[in-house]
Amino acid sequence: MTGTTTARSDDDSWDIASSVGATAVMVAAARAAETRSASPLIQDPFAQLLVERAGSGAWSVLASDGLRQQLAELDPDADRVMQYAVDYQAVRTRFFDGFFERAAHAGITQVVILAAGLDSRAYRLDWPAGTTVYEIDQPLVLQYKRHTLDAHDVRSACLRREVPVDLRQDWPAALQREGFDVAEPTAWLAEGLLMYLPTEAQDRLFELIVDQSAPGSRIAVEAVGPDNDKRQEFRSKMRAHFDRARKLAGMDGESLDVGSLMYHDENRTDVPQWLAGRGWTVRAIPAEVEMAEAGRPGYIEEDLRGNTLIEAELKG
């Protein structure tokens, strides 16, 4: 395998328009596009608001049906890549929405969303009375989301607590300062996160989650497949397509190189095995299987598969 390096550093930070923060805008744009579609798998009425105030980027094409139509006519392959991004995010979002619904039905009212980005579940899901949702992310990212939704009088459907801290820092202490109770079962979410952590940080993250989890807790995770030459080639093609989308939207420059923000570490810990070895009951579903079952099989090649959607429970 040809190795790749990351543009990240141990103490880097970002706002919503730069680095890892900009990837949250792309994900929100995909949710907005899915919500506007004829037969949406999800409903995120706040995604469009969050994208529109984030400035210009390749996401502007996803946020505009008119630009998408132009892209489809000028570059069908680029539009197909865009649609795959929308389909994947829709299926992933639906899976984790279901996770929270199941956790709520089990009586869990303490929720932690790690690297929350522009996640709007605190606002759009039907939470039981007494639910507290803790959102952990960079301070400027959380601030942008709060200011944007406050400006439109959008109110959360639960008690929402911001925890403005980097996950490479002492986030458990920050979480507890906001009222988190280690004695209560928790529903944890790590969605679209692990690829942006080096192996050691990923392992430490899960160790801390387990330390903070009372019996009855649940966790949902998106685990990424191993990096290889085929994935690197695919990312390069995607970036070229997004560059064309930017030009269509009247923007200069190149698209964000998402691959340069990731940590392409070999021998990452197998998340399902790791959790099972610590007493968690694990259900792991290949992402392509979940996509097929949702009627969104996509077009990715065999070598690009490998992402896994995971749900686990620590029995009481």
Curated annotation (Swiss-Prot):
The keyword Methyltransferase applies. This is Putative S-adenosyl-L-methionine-dependent methyltransferase MAB_4606c. Keywords: Methyltransferase, S-adenosyl-L-methionine, Transferase. Gene3D superfamilies: Vaccinia Virus protein VP39 (3.40.50.150). GO terms for molecular function: methyltransferase activity. Belongs to the UPF0677 family. Exhibits S-adenosyl-L-methionine-dependent methyltransferase activity. Its EC number is 2.1.1.-. GO terms for biological process: methylation. Signal peptide: none annotated. It is an enzyme of class 2 (transferase). S-adenosyl-L-methionine binds at D137, D166, L167. InterPro entries: Ppm1/Ppm2/Tcmp, SAM-dependent_MTases_sf, SAM_mthyl_Trfase_ML2640-like.
